Amino acid sequence: MSKKVSKQKIRISGQNQKLSEKPGLNSYKRYVEFLLILLLVFITYGNSIQNDYNLDDGYVVSLDNANLLTSKGISGIPEILTSKYSEGEGVTYGYRPFGKVTMAIEYSIWQNNPHLSHFVNLLLFAINVYLLLLFFKRIATMFNIENSALVYLPILFYIVHPIHTEVVCSIKNREEILCFSFLLAALLIYFKFNEQKKWWYLVPFLVFTMLAFFSKETAFN
């Protein structure tokens, strides 16, 4: 009798060990996935780090001694949050402060350095791709799709597709990356809310939704 009990304990402990290993394995897998995404992003767009500013970057950074709010650094953030996106002569439109906020923070750290700003764009795009991967995985789980190729191949295609070149390689277009990333984060949190029915999930959901809107108005289109 004691032998049977001991065998059962061994089986239970073995099962518990496997269950305890799963979170660690999942965490390791997530790290590997993100690092692979980061590697592919830098292979595809890494040459943009050597680029200078382009003409459109003048909307978000101080070029040719233009008096822009971002050149005030962190101290200019309150004014950025209460200003239009573009306030030129006869042209005033848009409200998308979050991209400018990131540029103001960067200016406080290293002032105008296009190479580091391009580097930040690549990191943000890698995060964007990883969030999209999590979204695809959630959709695959919802529809019981077990073929991992249907999840990973679209991600690979998304990274290397040339349509993203302008967004990733233009510092001004960081707002597009931020907008989509915050929307993906909001959707992933909504899935959590829909599963667990815990109201407090709605708080980060609303925060990320508003951050997407503050990145670019098209978040609500």
Residue ranges: model-predicted function:
Residues 2-221:
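Polytopic membrane enzymes that build or remodel cell-surface glycoconjugates and lipids
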